[in-house]
UniProtKB/Swiss-Prot annotation:
The gene is emilin1a. Residues 53-128 form the EMI domain. It comes from Danio rerio (Zebrafish). Residues 125-150, 811-869 are annotated as: Disordered. This is EMILIN-1-A. Keywords: Coiled coil, Disulfide bond, Extracellular matrix, Secreted, Signal.
Length: 1014
C-alpha cells in the first residue's frame, strides 16, 4: 500500500502541474481580451490595466515536500517454542532471525505555479501601483482569440479526462485495499519488489524534466510580464512580439501537456502492471500456503501413526492389569481355603515353620529385585558419563583437525602469493633488459651519426684539391649517363626488394629477441620452461594419486558409518530382547507364585495359624504384589521410553548419514576441479595421511567403545536430558561442518582464480612459441637466389668505384716548395708541462700521541639460540580406575616427541637429562587412596591421602578415628637415562573420573646432560 501511495502522490503532482498550466492559459486569455475602449482610455489617461484579472502575473514557486522512502533492511530475533514430538520432553526454544524493511522521511523540492501581483503592484487585489504605467497592448483579432480558446478548451478536456482516470484508479485501488482487508490484510513486504525501484527512478527523472520545463516557462512568463507591465509606445512591434511569444507559449504548453498526459498514462499502466504482479504473487503465496498445509497434514498423520505404539502399550498394560486382577482373585480363593483348613486343623507348630519359610522366600525375592534395580542405575550412570566423554572428545578432535586444515590453507595461499611476486620480479628483470638493449641501439645510432658527420667534415676540408677530379668524374658521368640510369633503375628495384627484406629481417630479429628474452641468451630459461612443464605433469600425477586417496577415505568413512548404523540396529534388537527378558522375569515370578501356591496347598492340612498373624501376612503379600505390579509397569514404561529414544537416535543418525553423503558429493565435486588446485595438493597429501591415521585411531576407539556399549547396554536406562544434550552437540557439529564446507568453497573459488590466471599465462607462452615457429618456417621458405645475384653485382660495382677513388686519393697533388715568408710575431705563453717523476721516500716520522677513545660500535647481530630440546607431556584420567595397578591417563593434552604412551600410562625418557614430574590424584569423598611413583619398576616416592601411619606394633591401641583425605600430589625432579620409564601405580582406593579432569599427570625436560658432564 505504501507503494500505491507513492504512485498516487506522483500522479497528483503531475496533475497539479497541469492545472497550474491551465490556470496560466486562463490568465493569459483573460488578460489578452481587453476592450478597445478601456485600453484606449487607459492609454489616454495613463491609468492601470482594466481586466478581469488585472495586475496579476504567473510565477513559478518551489516548495519542500516530505515523503517516505525505503532505507535498507534491519534484522530482529524472535523466539519460537517447539513442542516435543512424543510429549515427554521439555519445550525447545529456537531463536530465528527475521528481516524487515527500514523507512526514512526524505524531503524533496517541488516547483508549482502561483498567481501573484505583477511588478510594481501590491495590495489584496493588486490594485495599488504606480499611475505612470501605461497599457500599450492591442486587442487581438477575433480569429486569434477563437484559435486560442479552442486550444485551451482541448487542453481542459484532456485534463478533465485525466482527472476522471485518476478518480477511477483511486476507486479501484480503494476497492482492492478493502478486499485485501476483508481477506486477511496484506502484510507489508520485507523488501522492495524488483520493479519498484526502477519505476520510482523513471518517475523521478520525469519530474526533474518537468521541473526544468517549468523553470523555462517561468522565465518566459517573467519576460511577458515585464513586457506587459513596462511597455513603451511602440505598439506594432510589441503586438508582433507578443503574438509570436503567445504562439510559442501555447505550442510549448500543448507539447508539455501531451508529455504530462503520456507520463500519467505510463504511470497508470505501470501501476496496473504492478497490481497484476502483486495478484500473481498473492496466488503463488496461496499455493505455497496450501503446500504447507498438506505438509502439516502429513506430519500430523505421521504423529498419529507414531502414537499407535502408545495404544499398543495401553493394551499391554490393560492385559497386565487383567492378569494382576486374576492373580488377586486366585489369591483370595486360596486365602479362603486356607482359612477353612486352619479352622478345621488345630496344629500350630508346622504353620509357624511354613510362615517363616514363606517370609524368607519373600525377603530373598525383595533383595534380588533391589539388587537388580541398583545395578541398572549404576550402569546407566556409567554409560551416560562415558557417552558424554566420548562425544566431547570427538568434537575436540574434529575442531582441532578443522583448525589445522585452515592454518594449512592459509600457509599455502601465502606460498602462492610469494610465487606470484617472484614471477612479477622476473618479468620486471626482462623489462629492464629490454630497456638496456634499447639504450645500446641508441648509442649505436649516435655513433653512426658522428661518423657520418666526421666524413662530411674531412671531405669539405679537401674540396679545393679535388675540383679537377670532380670535373673528370663529371665527364665520366656524362659519358656513362645511360649506364647510370639503367643502374639507377636496377638500384631502385633492389632497394624496394631490400626494404621488404629489411622489414622481414627486422621482424625476424624482434621475434628472435623475444625468444631470447623468454629462453635466455644461452637457453637457460628454456630449460626452466621445460622443467616447469615436467613439474606440471608430475603435479597432475600427484593430483590423480590424491584423487585415489580421497576416494579411499570416502569409502572408509562410509563403511565406518554403515558399520556404526548396523551396530545401533543390533543394540535396538537387544533392547527389544530386554523386553522379552522382562517378560521372562514376570513368568519366573508367576512360576514362583505357582510354587508358593503348591506349597501352600501341601501345607493346608498341616498348618494352623492364628487369624491375626495370617491377616498380617496376607496384607504384606498384597503390598508386595502391588509393588511388583507397579515396578513392572514402571519397567515397561521405561523400556518403551528407551525404544523411542533409540528410534530418535536412529533417525538422527540417518540424517547425519545423509549430510555425510552430501559432504561426500561435495568432495567429489571438488575432485572434478583437481586440475585447478594442483598447487595445494602436494601439501594436502601429507595432511590426508595424518588425518587417515587419526581417523583410524578414532574408528578403533569407536569400535572399542561400541564393544563396551554392547556389553553394558542390556539393562541400560538412558536419561532424557543426556539425549537432548547429545543431540544439541550433534547439531553444533553439523553446523560447524556446514561452515567448513563454506570455507572450502571460498578457498576453492580463490584457488580457481589463481590457477586460471596461471593457465592463461601458459596459453600465452604456447601461442607465442607457435607464432615464432611459424615465422621461422616462413623465413626458411623464402627464395633468395635472385636477390643474392643482384647483391653480388651491386657489391662488385661498389668495389670498382672504391678502387678508383682510392687511386685518386693516392695521387700526389703537392707542388714545388715556395719562398720563405716573413718572421711572425711572438706567440703567447704555452701551457705548463707534464709533471715530473716522484722523488725518493723520506725517513719514517716519530710516533704520535695516543688519540682519544673512539665512538661505541654498532650492536652486533643476535646470536643463535642454544640447542635445547623441547620435551613435555600432560595427560588426565577420564575413565574409571577401580582396581589397583598402573594408572592409565587416557586423555592427552600435549605429548611432544610421543614419549608418553596413553595406552599403558608409562613415560619413556628419549634423552638423558634432568626431568620434572607432577601429579595430582583425586579420589572419592572420605575414601583413602595410596599411590607410588615408580622409576623403571622401582618405587621412588609414595603418597597417602590419610597421612603417615606407623606400622605394626608402633601403632597406638586407642586413637581417634579421623576422616581420611582423598588427594595425593607428587612434585619431583629426577635424573633419567635414555630408556628409563616413569609411571604411577595405585595401591589402594578408587580414583574419581569426570569429563572435567580431576586426576592429572604431567612432566617436562629441564635440560639435557652429556656423558662427560656426569
Amino acid at each position: 500500500m505504501a507503494l500505491y501511495f507513492v504512485y498516487l502522490s506522483t500522479l497528483l503532482a503531475l496533475i497539479l502541474l497541469g492545472d497550474n498550466w491551465a490556470a496560466g492559459t486562463y490568465a493569459s486569455r483573460y488578460t489578452q481580451h481587453v476592450d478597445e475602449n478601456q485600453s484606449g482610455a487607459a492609454a489616454q489617461s495613463g491609468s492601470k490595466v482594466t481586466s478581469r484579472h488585472r495586475n496579476w502575473c504567473a510565477y513559478v514557486v518551489t516548495r519542500t515536500v516530505s515523503c517516505v522512502m525505503e532505507d535498507g533492511v534491519e534484522t530482529y530475533v524472535k523466539p519460537e517454542y517447539q513442542r516435543c514430538a512424543w510429549g515427554q520432553c521439555s519445550h525447545v526454544v529456537l531463536y530465528r532471525t527475521y528481516r524487515k524493511p527500514r523507512y526514512k522521511v526524505a524531503y524533496k523540492v517541488v516547483s508549482e505555479m502561483e498567481w501573484k501581483c505583477c511588478h510594481g503592484y501590491s495590495g489584496d487585489d493588486c490594485s495599488d501601483g504606480s499611475s505612470a504605467i501605461h497599457d500599450s497592448r492591442a486587442r487581438p483579432t477575433g480569429e486569434e482569440g477563437r484559435s486560442d480558446s479552442d486550444r485551451i478548451r482541448q487542453l481542459e478536456e484532456q485534463i478533465q479526462s485525466l482527472n476522471k482516470n485518476l478518480h477511477n484508479l483511486q476507486k479501484k485501488i480503494y476497492e482492492e485495499s478493502q478486499r485485501e482487508g476483508i481477506s486477511g490484510g496484506n502484510n507489508l513486504a520485507d523488501a522492495a519488489q524488483p520493479g519498484m525501484k526502477e519505476t520510482i527512478h523513471s518517475i523521478q527523472t520525469k519530474l526533474d524534466m518537468l521541473d526544468n520545463m517549468t523553470r523555462v516557462h517561468d522565465k518566459t512568463l517573467t519576460n511577458i510580464n515585464n513586457h506587459l507591465v513596462g511597455g513603451n509606445g511602440i505598439e506594432n512591434e510589441l503586438d508582433s512580439r507578443y503574438g509570436t511569444l503567445k504562439e510559442e507559449i501555447l505550442r510549448e504548453l500543448e507539447r508539455r501537456v501531451t508529455l504530462s498526459c503520456s507520463s500519467c498514462q505510463t504511470g497508470v499502466e505501470s501501476i496496473q502492471r504492478q497490481h497484476q504482479e502483486d495478484r500473481e504473487r498473492i496466488r503463488e503465496l496461496e499455493k505455497h500456503i496450501s503446500v504447507m498445509e498438506q505438509h502439516h497434514q502429513q506430519t500430523l498423520d505421521l504423529l498419529s501413526r507414531s502414537q499407535s505404539c502408545c495404544d499398543s502399550l495401553d493394551r499391554k498394560l490393560s492385559a497386565i492389569d487383567r492378569k494382576v486382577s486374576s492373580t488377586a482373585e486366585t489369591y483370595d480363593i486360596l486365602r479362603g481355603r486356607l482359612e477353612k483348613e486352619l479352622r478345621s486343623n488345630g496344629n500350630g507348630g508346622r504353620g509357624k515353620a511354613m510362615e517363616e519359610k514363606l517370609n524368607n522366600r519373600l525377603r530373598d525375592l525383595e533383595r534380588r529385585l533391589n539388587g537388580t534395580v541398583r545395578k541398572t542405575e549404576q550402569k546407566c550412570s556409567h554409560t551416560e558419563t562415558s557417552m558424554k566423554e566420548f562425544v566431547q572428545r570427538e568434537i575436540g578432535q574434529i575442531k582441532n583437525s578443522v583448525l589445522g586444515r585452515n592454518d594449512d590453507h592459509g600457509y599455502r595461499i601465502s606460498t602462492v602469493e610469494i610465487d606470484i611476486q617472484d614471477l612479477k620480479r622476473f618479468i620486471n628483470d626482462h623489462k629492464n633488459n629490454l630497456e638496456r638493449l634499447g639504450n645500446k641501439t641508441n648509442d649505436l645510432d649516435s655513433g653512426l651519426k658522428s661518423a657520418i658527420h666526421l666524413c662530411t667534415e674531412t671531405c669539405a676540408a679537401k674540396g679545393s684539391e679535388t675540383e679537377d677530379t670532380v670535373k673528370s668524374l663529371e665527364w665520366k658521368v656524362v659519358a656513362n649517363e645511360e649506364d647510370i640510369k639503367k643502374f639507377d633503375t636496377k638500384l631502385k628495384d633492389i632497394s624496394v626488394s631490400g626494404d621488404s627484406l629489411l622489414d622481414r629481417v627486422i621482424d625476424l630479429s624482434n621475434d628472435v629477441q623475444k625468444i631470447k628474452d623468454l629462453t635466455g641468451q644461452n637457453g637457460e630459461h628454456f630449460n626452466q620452461i621445460v622443467t616447469d612443464v615436467e613439474n606440471l605433469g608430475r603435479d597432475c600425477d600427484v593430483c590423480s594419486s590424491i584423487d585415489g586417496e580421497l576416494q579411499k577415505i570416502r569409502n572408509v568413512t562410509s563403511y565406518a558409518f554403515d558399520k556404526f548404523q548396523a551396530e545401533l540396529t543390533v543394540l535396538g534388537r537387544k533392547v527389544f530382547s530386554d523386553e522379552h527378558v522382562c517378560s521372562q522375569v514376570c513368568s519366573n515370578l508367576q512360576e514362583e507364585v505357582g510354587k508358593l501356591k503348591e506349597e501352600v496347598e501341601k501345607c493346608t492340612g498341616q498348618c494352623m495359624i492364628s487369624m491375626a498373624d495370617h491377616q498380617r501376612n496376607v496384607d504384606n503379600q498384597n503390598t508386595v504384589t502391588r509393588k511388583l505390579g507397579k515396578d513392572l509397569k514402571s519397567i515397561q514404561g521405561e523400556l518403551t521410553g528407551i525404544l523411542q529414544i533409540f528410534n530418535s537416535i536412529n533417525d538422527t543418525l540417518k540424517g547425519l548419514r545423509n549430510t555425510i553423503q552430501k559432504h561426500g558429493n561435495n568432495i567429489t565435486d571438488l575432485n572434478t576441479s583437481k586440475g585447478k588446485i594442483y598447487l595445494e595438493l602436494d601439501q594436502l597429501y601429507d595432511d590426508l595421511n595424518k588425518h587417515k591415521v587419526d581417523s583410524k585411531g578414532h574408528f578403533d576407539s569407536i569400535s572399542s567403545f561400541n564393544s563396551n556399549l554392547m556389553t553394558e547396554m542390556g539393562e541400560c536406562r538412558l536419561s532424557r536430558e543426556g539425549l537432548d544434550k547429545r543431540l544439541s552437540k550433534m547439531e553444533d557439529v553439523c553446523g560447524r561442518l556446514d561452515t567448513l564446507s563454506e570455507n572450502l568453497k571460498t578457498i576453492k573459488d580463490g584457488l580457481s582464480k589463481h590457477v586460471s590466471g596461471l593457465w592463461t599465462c601458459v596459453n600465452d607462452l604456447n601461442s607465442t612459441v607457435i607464432s615464432h615457429s611459424e615465422t621461422i618456417s616462413r623465413i626458411h621458405n623464402v627464395h633468395l637466389e635472385n636477390i643474392q645475384g643482384r647483391m653480388n653485382n651491386l657489391n662488385s660495382s661498389i668495389r670498382n668505384v672504391l678502387k678508383e677513388f682510392q687511386i685518386f686519393t693516392e695521387q700526389d697533388f703537392t707542388g714545388p716548395p715556395g719562398l720563405p715568408g716573413p718572421q711572425g710575431e711572438k706567440g703567447s705563453k704555452g701551457p705548463p708541462g707534464p709533471r715530473g717523476p716522484l722523488g725518493k721516500e723520506g725517513p719514517q716520522g716519530r710516533v704520535g700521541p695516543v688519540g682519544p677513545p673512539g665512538l661505541r660500535g654498532e650492536q652486533g647481530p643476535p646470536g643463535k639460540d642454544a640447542n635445547v630440546p623441547r620435551l613435555s607431556f600432560s595427560a588426565a584420567l577420564t575413565r574409571p580406575q577401580a582396581s589397583s595397578g598402573t594408572i592409565i591417563f587416557n586423555k592427552v593434552f600435549i605429548n611432544e616427541r610421543k614419549a608418553y604412551n596413553p595406552k599403558t600410562g608409562v613415560f619413556t625418557a628419549p634423552v638423558r637429562g634432568r626431568y620434572f614430574f607432577s601429579a595430582v590424584l583425586t579420589g572419592h569423598k572420605n575414601v583413602k587412596i595410596e599411590a607410588v611413583l615408580s622409576k623403571s619398576n622401582f618405587g621412588i616416592a609414595r603418597g597417602d591421602s590419610a597421612g603417615y601411619q606407623p606400622e605394626g606394633l608402633e601403632k597406638p591401641m586407642a586413637e581417634a578415628r579421623h576422616t581420611p583425605g582423598s588427594l595425593v600430589i607428587f612434585n619431583i625432579v629426577l635424573p633419567l637415562q635414555e630408556g628409563d620409564t616413569i609411571c604411577i601405580d595405585l595401591v589402594t582406593g578408587k580414583l574419581a573420573h569426570s569429563v572435567e579432569p580431576l586426576t592429572i599427570f604431567s612432566g617436562m625436560l629441564l635440560y639435557e646432560e652429556s656423558e662427560d658432564r656426569l
